[in-house]
Structure formats: C-alpha cells, structure tokens
Amino acid sequence: MNKLNATIVDYQQEDHLLQVRVSLAHTIWHVLLIDSASARKLLEPGREVHVLFKESAIALSKDEHIEMGIQNKLTCKTRQVNRGELLCQIILEQESHAITAIVPTAMVDAFMIVPGQRLTAWIRANELILES
C-alpha cells in the first residue's frame, strides 16, 4: 500500500458522495469518498492527512501530457524494476516520495522501462483512501 502525505484543501458534496481536494507534491489531487459524519470530521481545510492507494491501482505512461480520464498524476523517476514472469514491481521516486506500482510484465517490456527513466503515475480518484 502506498502512503503519501497531503493537506486537505476543500471538498464538495453531492447526495452521498464527497469530492475532496488535497494538496500533494505541489499538485491538487481529487479523492472520491462516500459521505458520512465521520468522514466529514476529517475534512477541515489545512488538516494533514495521508493518501493511500494500492500498488495495482497505478497506471503508468511515458508521456505526462497525454489526454487521459484520470485527474491524479505524479511525474516520477524509475528507481528499480523487479521482474516477474507475469507482473513487475516498479519502485518510483517523486521528490521525497517513494511509490510502488505493480504492472504487467508485457507493459514493462513494451515501454522498455529501466531505472532512471521518467514515467507518469496516474491514480483514479475512487482508488484513493484518506487516513488521518
């Protein structure tokens, strides 16, 4: 599980859905949550939180400027590639953050991913969890 530090910016509510904006690594990320009284208690602007997401929730691209229907992204440097027959574990660095992605080996081969290469990690808003 990846865990990054973030700060609550604000949130919007529609019915039982909350869209929370957090500041993370000099960008604004969007997190979708199911509304609850306990969730709203955590959403005070300026509050420090952790954003969590699974290694398998990351999509990777070689170009950060491609049009994609995913709002949250981090441009990273590849630190390490651990190959398996079907899946690879890729360790990425973004400033002081280390992020782990699990992706198909075929994708790693197609992208020719090697340590030192720049990649963009994309994470959907509904794949994120907030932790206080």
Region roles according to the model:
Residues 90-104, 123-130:
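Hydrophobic transmembrane alpha-helix bundles
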Residues 19-25, 32-33, 89-95, 102:
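Short, acidic/hydrophobic/Gly-rich beta-strand patch recurrent on exposed beta strands
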Residues 11-17, 81-87:
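Short, conserved beta-turn/loop elements at beta-strand boundaries and strand-helix junctions
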Residues 15, 24-26, 53, 85, ...:
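A generic beta-sheet turn/junction motif
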